Amino acid sequence: MKKQRVVVKIGSSSLADSHGGISTEQLSDHVAALARLKEDGHEVVLITSGAVAAGFSALGYPSRPVTIKGKQAAAAVGQSLLMQAYTEEFRKYGIVTAQLLLTRSDFSRKEQYSNAYATLGELLNRSALPIINENDSISLEELTFGDNDMLSALVSGLVSADMLMIFTDVNGLYDKNPQKNADAKKYYFLPEVTEEISSLAGDAGSKLGTGGMKSKIDAAKTALSLGVSVFIGTGRGQEKFVNVLKGKGDGTYVGNAPQKEMKMNKQWIALHSLVSGQIEVDAGAATAIIQHGKSLLPAGVTNVSRFFQVGEVVEVVTQQGRVIGKGQCTYSAEELIDVKGMQSQDIQVRGERHSYEVIHRDHWVSL
């Protein structure tokens, strides 16, 4: 089997014991299986939930807290306990671990996003195993983020993973709730995530986690759009992750055809960037951008809305108001208002400008 880069997401329900705390047995089982992947030469990134589950009992809570401050306090205590447990287990296999705590804002800010990309790349090049969790103790978004499901999809795209494995307490996707319907049909393979598939999943998570099956399906859809195949399921034993790569996993495989990898810069524009303004274009410009992959030139711009600076992301709309995409603008709003509708040869070069493109095709994403 060729060497692959794999992102494994382990949810709270796959780590917890009967009392809601972290099960040493389950954690050891996961680590042994991850070590097997490394032994076979694969590169591994672990996305782990469980900080709240690891910490709530230490603070005297009888069960997982329901208030935001309770969850964040439990996460602050539990994250160090969780990381300590992982580090000690991986040390038995001679594997060096690294901790990264991320928030949504780390993805929306280009510099921090690029730093995360560079750090993960260096860790993998050095054969370390990055362990990533949402920074639960300060991030409100995490507590409704889907139990790290979407985070795992975004990270899998960021590191250009070959596969994302989302491990949970259910062995795949079904057309009905298998716990309530004996005739529930399991999906062993789905070529894509359709609206019909999305509608089958409920929003509710387990008592120990915040993510239901819908968040996993949404994560799978995002990962597929970034060129990453997905597995959603469960398993036990040292071979469980290796078996997933061999096509023998106990769950559902989603998308296995080679996908076109989305470059890091375009991932950031498409999924994380904040839109600072809007540019309206004529029909000719819209066709050139969407159908022919051209850059946007000033001649095609018909209107500029809101104030934005050079390098900020703007959305582009047709004269009918339909959003066709977004990209990084090489002009400020003030500059663009002065040159909109003009041919490139008629525009006086300002300052150090070396290009007349409003949005270069390398910094554009169609929606």
From Swiss-Prot:
InterPro entries attached to this UniProt entry: AceGlu_kinase-like_sf (IPR036393), Asp/Glu/Uridylate_kinase (IPR001048), G5K_ProB (IPR041739), Glu/AcGlu_kinase (IPR001057), Glu_5kinase (IPR011529), Glu_5kinase/COase_Synthase (IPR005715), Glutamate_5-kinase_CS (IPR019797), PUA (IPR002478)
Molecular-function GO terms, alphabetical: ATP binding; glutamate 5-kinase activity; RNA binding
Binding of ATP, residues: K9, T168, D169, T210, G211, G212, M213, K214, S215, K216
Intracellular or extracellular location(s): Cytoplasm
Main localization of the protein described in the UniProt heading: cytoplasm
Enzyme class, broadest EC rank: transferase
Keyword ATP-binding found: yes
Record bears the keyword Nucleotide-binding: yes
Record field: catalytic activity: L-glutamate + ATP = L-glutamyl 5-phosphate + ADP
Domain PUA residues, every copy: 276-350
Pathway: Amino-acid biosynthesis; L-proline biosynthesis; L-glutamate 5-semialdehyde from L-glutamate: step 1/2
Residues noted as binding substrate in the record, renumbered to the chain: S49, D136, N148
Protein function: Catalyzes the transfer of a phosphate group to glutamate to form L-glutamate 5-phosphate.
Family: Belongs to the glutamate 5-kinase family.
Protein known as: Glutamate 5-kinase
Organism of provenance: Bacillus cereus (strain ATCC 14579 / DSM 31 / CCUG 7414 / JCM 2152 / NBRC 15305 / NCIMB 9373 / NCTC 2599 / NRRL B-3711)
Organism lineage: Bacteria, Bacillati, Bacillota, Bacilli, Bacillales
Gene field: proB
